[in-house]
């Protein structure tokens, strides 16, 4: 029985993995609730997922290093994301007042394209921030690289896109699932989704960072 629960057993590792994602998820949700610290929450989520995949474990010291080196850049990106989403929402409200079906279709297509591009950039910039220091002078370069990586590895990118779209779509189609889905995301689902995104992107990001270092 002692071997069954030993630190090197599969059961212990699985329970440790679940507990880590649970704690990280709760910490991130608290950060998102404060709004201004949302960028740090994303760093915590992506940093923890990266450590789990590369090292098999997450220590507070390692996670703190990941957060400390990029917290300011992450905060700026987060606030820019919020402003961008507010702009898209405002444009969507105006779109409802447009009478011409052609203009409405064209405008709606541009809004959807803008949202998709922003989402693709975010899906790759946060893993980059979690893995290395990004100076202010290189931020725009990293954003362009994130966009290029998202297009270059489109099938992997759409894993994150699917996870992002699936949750609101599920709630829209099944109103009775709202509280269950909300509880899942608040307790575990957010960290689990980030883990899947980081896992899908690990190989191309490893190759990209190795090519930069050489």
Regions found by a protein language model. Give the residues of each.
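Helix-coil boundary and N-terminal low-complexity module in membrane systems
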Residues: 1-111, 118-214
């Amino acid at each position: 029985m002692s071997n069954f629960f030993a630190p090197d057993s599969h059961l212990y590792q699985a329970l440790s993995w679940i507990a880590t994602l649970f704690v990280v998820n709760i910490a991130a949700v608290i950060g998102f609730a404060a709004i201004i610290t949302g960028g740090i929450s994303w760093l915590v989520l992506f940093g923890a997922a990266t450590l789990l995949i590369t090292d098999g474990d997450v220590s507070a010291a390692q996670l703190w290093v990941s957060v400390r080196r990029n917290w300011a850049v992450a905060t700026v990106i987060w606030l820019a994301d919020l402003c961008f989403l507010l702009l898209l929402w405002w444009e969507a409200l105006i779109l409802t007042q447009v009478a011409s079906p052609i203009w409405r279709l064209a405008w709606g297509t541009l809004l959807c394209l803008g949202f998709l591009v922003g989402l693709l950039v975010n899906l790759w910039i946060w893993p980059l921030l979690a893995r290395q220091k990004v100076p202010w002078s290189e931020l725009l370069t990293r954003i362009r690289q994130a966009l290029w990586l998202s297009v270059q590895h489109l099938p992997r990118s759409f894993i994150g896109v699917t996870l992002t779209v699936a949750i609101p779509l599920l709630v829209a189609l099944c109103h009775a699932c709202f509280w269950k889905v909300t509880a899942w995301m608040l307790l575990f689902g957010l960290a689990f989704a980030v883990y899947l995104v980081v896992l899908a992107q690990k190989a191309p990001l490893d190759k990209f960072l190795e090519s930069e270092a050489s």
